[in-house]
């Protein structure tokens, strides 16, 4: 959650049973940073970190989490960028476990800059983008996508991410007009790819968490339900 999930926020999550905590999304290149500034001007939360300071900033945030002695999980960072270069650069942070390509955020400013959801418009471009990150970084790679975007074939996108060699596909199974996830998207993707699926959207209790896993996700992610620094159910019971 941009402007929210920094190291201090993630530290609140370290004792709740998560095996992965994700920082970001951070605006990683000049196009994304410029878009982020426009978003801030209209009153939305964003991380505002200069490109030349981002490596040091994320390093500090990752170390803050890893220094929690009771936390033995991994740390990921979600990055918005119109090109792979800065994502590859951030992947060099020694303490970081996973870089996540943001093909998910739908703010108009980001889409116009070629970031976030804009990457879903052409599966070949997304595959090439992801392949370059996979090829040139030595960390695990995740790609976060948004489901049910007009004109986008979710299965084709998942196949592109899979073919690119990513380790994870993180699916926001958004169901427009409904206050629940579109579990059928997870089912369709599961039938077509072998990649590790992280299911996201409206996971707020044991029922929704179990439904996501039953639909074919290998793991779940929680965002808004954790906004107060805790979660409303016991992860060990999922």
Model-derived features: positions:
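N-terminal capping/small domains of soluble enzymes
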Residues: 1-85
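Hydrophobic faces of well-ordered beta-strands that scaffold small-molecule active sites
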Residues: 1, 19-24, 73-79, 99-101, ...
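Glycine-rich phosphate-binding active-site loops on the catalytic face of alpha/beta enzymes
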Residues: 21-31, 98-110, 164-178, 215-236
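Well-ordered, non-transmembrane segments within structured domains
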Residues: 73-112, 125, 151-162
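Catalytic cores of alpha/beta
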Residues: 6-15, 84-95, 149-163, 191-193, ...
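Helix C-cap/helix->beta junction micro-motif
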Residues: 71, 136-137, 164-165, 193
